[in-house]
C-alpha cells in the first residue's frame, strides 16, 4: 500500500481495502477505502506550539502524521512538553488529524515524564478507576474466625518467604515441618486472591482487563489496587493470610509420598531476600551479615528456620537432578539489572545471577505446578467441572535446532546437539549449556537455545510439557 493510498489508516487499524494489480507487473497493490475500526486514538508526543495552534509529534515512529491541536484544545500546555493527545476528528480535506490534549506529562528526558510516557504509549494504566478503588476499600483487613474454620490451619508451622530484596509484594511462601516418621511436610502457599476478588465485580473486571502486573525498572504497575497487591494478598511476615496451598509429604530422597491441595490460613515468621537465604545456604550458619541484610544491620535467624532452609536446599537439589534426568532443559541466562539512586536514576549496572536460593524457590514452585496439573489431568471424564487450563510447551523447532547446531560448531562445539529423540535432544542441549557456561559466547548461545524452544501456550488440551 503506497503512502498516498493509506486513506488515513493508522498502524493496526481494521480497514477495508481495494486490491488491484500494478501496471506491467503481477505485484498487488491496495487502496484503503474505509476505516472500519481504529486500533488506537491516543498518542504520546512532544508539543510544537505556534501562536494560535500546536502540533503534537508522536513518539511512535509508525505514526506517520502529526496531530493538529487548536488553541482551545491545548490545555495551556507549553511548547516542548510531552503530552497525551487524543484524535477527535480527521476532516476529509485535511492531511492531518485534529486532536485535543488530555494530559500534560512534563519535559522530555525527565524520569517521571518518560516512565509515564511508556505506560500511556502501551496502554498500561497506572491509576485505578474510582469505582475500583472504592470497591477495594470495602475489603476487610482482618480474617474472621468463621473463615479460618473453613480452612486447613497452618499458622503454627515454620513459614517464610524468599523474594528479591526490592520486592513490595510477596506472592508465595514455604512452610516446613519434620514428621514423626522422619519425612518432611512441605507447604507451597500462594495468596488466595479469589477470596477477595469475586466474579462480576468492578475489581474482577479491572483485573481481567489488566491481565497481569507489569514490572518496570523502578516500579510495578499492579493488576490489583494496593490494598490487595501489597496488603491482604501479600504474604507479609507476622500477619495471618488466606492462601491456597499444595502440601506434600516428602522423604529424604525427594520422593512425594502424599499430597493435599486446598485453602489454608498461614502466618509467615520471616521475610528473606534471596541474598540473605543464600548466605544461610553458603555458611550453614544462622547469622545474616550487615553487608547482606536488607535492614542494614546484622541479625540472627531462628534455628528452626535455618534447618528448614538447609533441608529444603538439599531436597531442591535432588528434585532438580530428577528433572534433568527426565529430560528437563535448564537455562541459566544472565539478567542485566540497574542500580538506581534515590531519584530512580540509573547509576550502575550489574548482572543478576541465579544462585541456590533462587533455584530452591524455583524447584518447589515447579513441584507444586506439576503436581496440581497431574492431579487434575488424572481425573476421568470430560465434565465441565474438570476443565482446567494447562501451560504447555510443544516440541522445539527442528529447523531452529539445526541452525543452532551450525552456529555452535563455529565455536568449536561440533556435534553437540543429538536430535535422535526427545531424551537425547534435551540431554545434549543441557550438556552444551553446561560446556558454554561462563564463557564469552554463553549468553548468545543460551539466547539462541531459548529461541529454538516452542513458546508456552495456555490451553485446556493437555498435550504435555516439553522439557
Question: Predicted segment positions?
Answer:
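Electropositive polyanion-binding surfaces
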Residues: 84, 90-91, 117-124, 131-467
Amino acid at each position: 500500500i503506497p503512502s498516498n493510498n493509506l486513506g488515513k489508516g493508522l498502524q493496526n487499524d481494521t480497514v477495508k481495502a481495494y486490491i488491484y494489480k500494478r501496471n506491467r507487473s503481477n505485484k498487488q497493490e491496495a487502496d484503503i477505502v474505509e476505516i472500519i475500526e481504529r486500533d488506537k486514538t491516543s498518542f504520546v508526543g512532544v508539543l510544537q506550539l505556534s501562536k494560535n495552534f500546536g502540533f503534537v509529534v508522536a513518539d511512535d515512529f509508525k505514526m506517520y502524521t502529526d496531530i493538529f491541536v487548536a488553541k482551545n484544545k491545548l490545555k495551556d500546555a507549553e511548547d516542548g512538553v510531552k503530552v497525551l493527545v487524543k484524535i477527535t476528528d480527521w476532516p476529509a480535506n485535511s492531511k492531518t488529524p485534529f486532536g485535543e490534549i488530555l494530559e500534560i506529562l512534563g519535559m522530555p528526558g525527565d524520569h517521571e515524564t518518560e516512565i509515564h510516557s511508556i505506560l500511556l504509549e502501551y496502554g498500561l494504566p497506572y491509576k485505578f478507576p474510582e469505582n475500583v478503588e472504592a470497591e477495594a476499600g470495602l475489603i476487610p483487613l482482618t480474617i474472621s474466625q468463621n473463615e479460618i474454620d473453613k480452612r486447613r490451619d497452618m499458622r503454627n508451622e515454620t513459614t517464610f518467604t524468599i523474594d528479591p530484596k526490592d520486592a513490595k509484594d510477596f506472592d508465595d511462601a514455604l512452610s516446613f515441618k519434620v514428621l514423626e516418621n522422619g519425612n518432611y511436610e512441605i507447604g507451597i502457599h500462594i495468596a488466595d486472591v479469589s477470596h477477595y476478588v469475586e466474579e462480576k465485580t468492578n475489581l474482577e473486571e479491572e483485573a481481567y482487563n489488566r491481565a497481569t502486573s507489569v514490572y518496570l525498572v523502578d516500579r510495578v504497575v499492579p493488576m490489583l489496587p494496593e490494598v490487595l497487591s501489597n496488603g491482604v494478598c501479600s504474604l507479609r511476615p507476622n500477619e495471618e493470610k488466606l492462601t491456597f496451598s499444595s502440601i506434600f509429604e516428602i522423604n529424604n530422597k525427594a520422593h512425594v509420598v502424599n499430597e493435599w491441595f486446598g485453602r489454608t490460613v498461614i502466618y509467615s515468621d520471616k521475610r528473606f531476600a534471596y541474598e540473605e537465604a543464600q548466605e544461610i545456604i553458603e555458611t550453614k550458619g544462622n547469622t545474616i551479615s550487615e553487608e547482606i541484610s536488607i535492614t542494614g544491620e546484622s541479625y540472627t535467624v531462628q534455628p528452626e528456620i535455618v534447618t528448614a532452609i538447609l533441608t529444603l536446599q538439599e531436597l531442591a537439589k535432588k528434585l532438580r537432578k530428577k528433572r534433568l534426568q527426565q529430560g528437563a532443559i535448564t537455562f541459566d541466562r544472565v539478567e542485566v539489572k540497574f542500580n538506581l539512586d534515590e531519584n530512580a536514576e540509573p547509576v550502575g549496572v550489574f548482572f543478576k545471577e541465579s544462585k541456590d536460593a533462587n533455584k530452591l524457590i524455583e524447584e518447589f514452585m515447579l513441584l507444586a505446578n506439576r503436581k496440581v496439573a497431574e492431579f487434575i489431568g488424572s481425573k476421568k471424564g470430560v465434565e465441565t467441572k474438570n476443565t482446567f487450563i494447562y501451560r504447555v510447551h510443544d516440541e522445539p523447532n527442528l529447523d531452529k535446532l539445526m541452525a543452532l547446531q551450525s552456529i555452535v560448531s563455529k565455536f568449536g562445539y561440533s556435534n553437540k546437539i543429538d536430535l535422535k529423540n526427545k531424551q537425547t535432544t534435551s540431554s545434549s542441549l543441557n550438556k552444551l549449556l553446561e560446556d558454554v557456561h561462563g564463557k564469552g559466547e554463553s549468553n548468545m548461545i543460551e539466547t539462541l537455545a531459548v529461541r529454538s524452544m516452542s513458546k508456552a501456550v495456555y490451553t485446556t488440551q493437555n498435550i504435555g510439557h516439553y522439557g
